[in-house]
Amino acid sequence: ATNAAETVFTTAEATKAKAGDIIHIRSAWPGLDEVIARVKEASESSVTLEDINTLNTGDFAAGGGAGSFRVIKSWEEMSQITEVASSGGEQQSIQLQFLSDTTQRNVNTFKTARVQTYTIAHDSSLPFYDLLRQADSSQDTLAAYMFVPKAKENRYWSAKASFNDIPNTAVNTVETVTATLNLQSGLTAYK
């Protein structure tokens, strides 16, 4: 991969990716690894990633972006979602004070891992139950997608799934199950 405002992958073999395809990236660059992106342009030997900026050589070492990608061919809708709860992403810091200084400072370190928990109205006949069970068992990293109508935005990320298919049951409420997505990449959004 190149260091560019819109990253270009050169492929060793002919690619079947085309403009508009959504791809799941594996890269030696941690900031690009597991990212889900849209192909802006494609030729037989390269693809340009839309809005994926790798110019910062502090984060993306020149010549270090080797990897691979796969085209996402289909999506399975998780229907009957009643709630989505997000957690994580909080900035962590350490406090630092030098002996010669009278002021203590906070220094940012990392952000906590991000998690999305989906509460779903229980219906064991829904086709995505089996997909979530398989993803929970294999712990493969999957591409995830959400369209937000009011924002007119397609949102993509990768995640490892956990699925609790035992319904939460209470009087006079809809039974629910939970799917948890442990995010493996940041959000990529396209309008």
Name each model feature, range by range:
Residues A12-P30, S137-A143:
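Short coil-to-beta transition motif at edge beta-strands of beta-rich domains
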Residues M146-K191:
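Short beta-strand and beta-hairpin "edge-sheet" elements
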